[in-house]
C-alpha cells in the first residue's frame, strides 16, 4: 500500500518520540485499572488498549460501546497540536470492522471523538491513537462542535483543578433499528451520548454524569446532568465497582455540577 509522505513523516516522528522519551506511558501503566472500570454484559466485540485510553468496540454497530481514560493535570498541559493527524482504520480489529474515513463522507455527521484529541496532547502516540476510527461515533455537527465540545473542555478544567479525573463515555442506542451510514462499512448512528466523570482525590471523591441527545439543538450542560446511577440504568453497565461500596454509592448518586466548578 502506498503511503503519503505526510504519513511516513508522522510514523518517523512517532518512532523517534517513543525511542527517545519516557513521557509516553505504557499501556500496562496507563490502564492498570481502566480495563475493569466498566462491568456488565458486553456485546459481541473487542476490547482495545491504546496509549491513553481503553475501549470496547461493538462489531455489529462499528462504534465503541464505551471508552475510558484517566486525564491528569499534567496531561492537560500538553501542547501537541492535532494538525496533521488523520483518521485511520484500526488494524487491531477484524478487516470487516476496520471503518474507513470515507465511510463518513457525505453522511451529514461529524466523526466525533469519544476520547477527544484535546485530552491526548501529551504525546505523539496518544494523539495518534485517538484518531483511530474505533474511537469515533457519528455525531450531529452542532453537538460535536458545541455542547459536546464544551463538556470536553470542562473535563479538562476539572482535571486541572482536582489533579486527575476518570472519564467514561460512549453512545446510547434507543431504537431497535438505528440509522446506518457508511459506503463500505455500516456504522450505526447513536440516539445520544453519555459521559461519566469521577475525581478520586482521597477524602474528596466526587462524581457526575451527563446525557446529550444526538441532535442539532443547543443543550446546556446543566440540563444534561445526570447521576452515574441513572447512566448505569441506561447502559446496563456497572461503573467503578471496585471502589469501596460507601464511596461508590455516594459518588454515583451525586448530580451537583457546582461541586466540580
Task: Annotate each language-model stretch with its function.
Residues 23-261:
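Domain-level detector for secreted/extracellular nuclease and nuclease-toxin modules, and
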